[in-house]
Amino acid sequence: MSGTHQQHADQCKSDFLIATLWRNKPLETIKAYIALTKPRVIELLLVATIPAMLQAERGEHNIILILLTVIGGWMGAAAANTFNMVADSDIDQRMGRTRARPLVKHTVSNRDASIFAWVLTVASFLWLWLLCNSLTAAVFVMITIAFYIFVYTKWLKRRTHMNIVWGGAAGCMPVAVGWAVIVDQFPEGQPQQWWQAIVLFLIIFFWTPPHTWALAMKYREDYKAAGVPMLPVVRTPVQVTRQIVWYSVATVLVTFLLIPAAGWIYAAAAVLAGVAFLWMAIRLHLGIKNGAEVKPLKLFILSNNYLAVLFLALSVDAVLGIQTIGEMMGWNTTFF
């Protein structure tokens, strides 16, 4: 049988299997489509978008607009994650952590997953543009999807150990999307405030490597088997944890840049949570260096909690409209 005929036969077999699943187990199929969107990964969307929007308009908040933005952003993130699963379906088969994914188990076909992703992409663009009145945010989401798939998934991920450093920029975009929606509500805009969005972007940018590498240390053999050159695969544990410490330091330092534009609640969280985050990163490095038994997953979990606490504090600060540190110090309040 020729290659073309074999592919056609495989596709027909897959379509028949999925049609049967849908007819006999519709709930399982729905769950499979939800799994394609990587719900846990999308949690970062909520953690980042909402605080950014609240900070962009301190003391005032439009709940409906925030909800609409989160929905539009969710569709964009879900589209990117689904495209990612389609592109990575070959390596997902070789990783124990990902062998239960829908495309590997053939619960959903690659073709149907791609159609699903395209529908979400178009819906996200139209939603943010028309319902959130922000063409800027809609364009940001399209750029993010393209970057995540073509730059990170298809190029960086399989070619360089710096994949998550540069590819992680896609995960920083929710803050830019949320900020753009608020700015676009004002005809004259607030260009002087964009520096805060850039700081929020950089916080997630520097936070992503230690967060991801901690997880990759645990699943090092999985990545190695799949041929993905994550840093823990191509470097020694000591070298990896040293990089984790440096990126953690950069993360905490960048969080301090936002203190003048925030109140004491955020300032306290940035310092206290930052110390805890740094201590855990340093402890992991010292443990590896001294040959002690360590659990990198603890840092992974703490890094999630760290970002959540930091952005929760920023949200509370913004909602309560607490006087900013910059205002307390008598600095230029127009800028801050």
Curated annotation (Swiss-Prot):
Membrane association type: Multi-pass membrane protein
Pathway: Porphyrin-containing compound metabolism; heme O biosynthesis; heme O from protoheme: step 1/1
Keywords of this entry: Cell membrane, Heme biosynthesis, Membrane, Transferase, Transmembrane, Transmembrane helix
Cellular component terms per the entry's GO annotation: plasma membrane
The UniProt record lists the keyword Transferase: yes
Regions that span the bilayer: 63-83, 125-145, 163-183, 197-217, 244-261, 265-287, 306-326
GO biological process, one term: heme O biosynthetic process
EC identifiers of the protein: 2.5.1.141
Source organism superkingdom: Bacteria
Entry's localization field: Cell membrane
MF terms in GO: protoheme IX farnesyltransferase activity
Function (record text): Converts heme B (protoheme IX) to heme O by substitution of the vinyl group on carbon 2 of heme B porphyrin ring with a hydroxyethyl farnesyl side group.
Other remarks on this protein: Carbon 2 of the heme B porphyrin ring is defined according to the Fischer nomenclature.
Homology family: Belongs to the UbiA prenyltransferase family. Protoheme IX farnesyltransferase subfamily.
Protein's name according to its UniProt entry: Protoheme IX farnesyltransferase
Naturally occurring in which organism (per UniProt): Corynebacterium efficiens (strain DSM 44549 / YS-314 / AJ 12310 / JCM 11189 / NBRC 100395)
Gene: ctaB
